[in-house]
Amino acid sequence: MKQGLSPDWITRLFEHPDLLRMGHHQRAEDQNLGMGWLYYAFGRMIRPRLAVVIGSWRGFVPLMIAKALQDNLESGEVVFIDPSLADDFWKDAARVNDYFLSLGVANIRHFRLTTQEFVKTSDYRALGKIGLVFIDSLHTEQQAQFDYEAFSGMLEPRGFVMLHDSMIVRPDKVYGGEKAYGMSVKYFVDRLKQDPMLQLLDLPFGHTGLTLLRKLDEEATRNPYDWLDDGPR
């Protein structure tokens, strides 16, 4: 598989119509990955050993981040957590593996669990440091907080958290109209914005937005060149 986001790879990706859905600002007509460009870029820029993605309709985000990590010299891995509650798409482990491999991505490890279940496993305890966390599970304030608190303590010093569906409060019908619930991730993000040791940026793209989060250095007075790669230029 060639490195980078080639036109051929994007064409193969968008042969799956569901990979154009769920608010990532994609568009097939001009092979536009929307926020997928950002997900890939962060994977390439941070170069993490490990990224965690919580929730995905058909795998757009884990695919974009895993493609980036696979293209890096460091050959990182994506841990993808999704219990397949919306439908049966993620239930068959062999089918899931074949699906990702069909798109040339071989570094996604899927766990068909909720975050609440995953944190009780030996796999969770063995994770170590994480460079990138993407939160897109049940879109409630409470679940977003649980997901964040489960992984934020493992974040690398220059790691990032991305929270999807973070700017709009509205009904969420992903489980069907009869099981609609209130999307409220924004309320958790609003609380995070009150923490002076966090830096957050809202990106108003897609249907419901994305928020980037990084932890500020606890030694805020030190020279920034101490942590920038290679010092001043």
Summary of predicted features, one role per range:
Residues 1-2, 30, 220:
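Intrinsically disordered, low-complexity regions enriched in Ser/Pro/Gly/Gln/His and often acidic
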Residues 25, 40-233:
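S-adenosylmethionine/decaboxylated-SAM
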Residues 14-45:
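Class I SAM-dependent methyltransferase Rossmann-like catalytic core
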Residues 1-19:
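N-terminal, positively charged/glycine-rich alpha-helical extensions of SAM-dependent methyltransferases
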